[in-house]
């Protein structure tokens, strides 16, 4: 039986979140064993925030949740790809559909931002 290897990165694994229909990579976040199990049990994506040092469910503040369609691991069992149905317009906390909207062009990084919501309105803190 394959067991996910959480030890290589100090208890965390990268989780690549991909739109199930388009194949677009929406975001990359980190999971520990607890958040992977929460994801598998609930059918929603859960992560561990290294910045805030806490667990969080995608969309718990914005409403832009993710329904899990399929979960895969790589040949080393130290990374997962989670194919999701994205609920709401955007996966990124900046309001963009994907967190990957900055592109390397002609020797520099260029932002191709097209926010679908205003983060200042959605994340009222």
UniProtKB/Swiss-Prot annotation:
It catalyses: 1-(5-phospho-beta-D-ribosyl)-5'-AMP + H2O = 1-(5-phospho-beta-D-ribosyl)-5-[(5-phospho-beta-D-ribosylamino)methylideneamino]imidazole-4-carboxamide. Pathway: Amino-acid biosynthesis; L-histidine biosynthesis; L-histidine from 5-phospho-alpha-D-ribose 1-diphosphate: step 3/9. InterPro entries: PRA-CH, PRib_AMP_CycHydrolase_dom, PRib_AMP_CycHydrolase_sf. The keyword Cytoplasm applies. Catalyzes the hydrolysis of the adenine ring of phosphoribosyl-AMP. Belongs to the PRA-CH family. Binds 1 Mg(2+) ion per subunit. Binds 1 zinc ion per subunit. Transmembrane segments: none annotated. Its EC number is 3.5.4.19. GO terms for biological process: L-histidine biosynthetic process. Homodimer. Signal peptide: none annotated. Its cofactor is Mg(2+); Zn(2+). This is Phosphoribosyl-AMP cyclohydrolase. Keywords: Amino-acid biosynthesis, Cytoplasm, Histidine biosynthesis, Hydrolase, Magnesium, Metal-binding, Zinc. GO terms for cellular component: cytoplasm. Zn(2+) binds at residues 75, 92, 99. It comes from Geobacter sp. (strain M21). The keyword Cytoplasm applies. It holds the Pfam family PRA-CH. GO terms for molecular function: magnesium ion binding; phosphoribosyl-AMP cyclohydrolase activity; zinc ion binding. The gene is hisI. Mg(2+) binds at residues 74, 76, 78. It is found in: Cytoplasm.
